[in-house]
Structure formats: C-alpha cells, structure tokens
C-alpha cells in the first residue's frame, strides 16, 4: 500500500510505503517511559528503538518523570500504575495540569479490570479519556500497535 504525499510547492507527488511512513513518524515521536523497575524501562527502551522509535527516554520514579516532563516535550508517556513515590494515576493528574494533550498508555501487572483499579486508586477517576491500558508482561508488538493507535 502506498501513501501519496503532495509537496508544498508545485504538483510533485512523493510515494512512500506505509512502513516507510510509519518509520518516519516513529523517528519523530518522543516517548517517556516511567516505571520504578529499571529492567522494565531498559527493556522497553531497547525494544522501542529496535522498532524504529529513536527518541525514547526513561524515568525510574514519578518525581523524576515529572521533572523530565516539565523540561521536555513528549508525544506519548508510558506510565506504570504502581510506583512508590506517586502512583501512575496521580502522576497523570499532575502532567495533565501542564499538558492536556499528551497521549498516555498505562501499564500494570494487575490482572483486574479497570473499574477495580479505579476503586483502589482514587486519582484514576480523572482518566476517563484514557483508552490505553496494557497488562504486564507486555508483548512488544502489541505495545507498538497501541502506541501507533495513540499517536496517530
């Protein structure tokens, strides 16, 4: 499948494959992975870079993540729900005060439904607009599909 892009000047058309287009988009997408387990953030970062995402950063605690977020500009955040300093939902609330448009995918090891999570974490009530919840262990191909759905 080819995607036609019209150049800004003149009638020149550039044809690129869907995969080439995705790769170009991946290169520009800035992702921040937030999880208190360094092996998780390292693994996600490596896997996402292998899939063509070149601008991937990590934070191993919520406070550092908030500091990084204030200092940078991100297209997507991958946030673990259970972290020691501040849970992922509370972090999400703080981030939404700064940027209401950033996309977020929550990751969790919980094997319970979203409604039950909302009962455990009061801050989860502000996440009605979030559709990206991924359970650990994470299938990286599924994660990439979910990221693509969120950023496009």
Question: Across the structure, where does each feature detected by a protein language model lie?
Answer:
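Receiver (REC) domain active-site loop signature in two-component systems and cognate sites
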Residues: 83
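Two-component/phosphorelay signaling modules centered on CheY-like receiver
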Residues: 38-57
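Short amphipathic alpha-helix used as the core "switch/output" element in two-component signaling
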Residues: 67, 89-100, 120-122
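Non-catalytic signal-transmission and effector/linker regions of two-component phosphorelay proteins
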Residues: 1-30, 135, 139-152
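Active-site residues of response regulator receiver
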Residues: 35, 80, 108
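Alpha4 helix (beta4-alpha4-beta5 surface) of REC/receiver domains from two-component response regulators
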Residues: 90, 111-132, 141, 145
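Active-site beta3 strand of CheY-like receiver
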Residues: 72-78
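Helix N-cap/capping motif at the beta->alpha junctions
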Residues: 58-67, 88
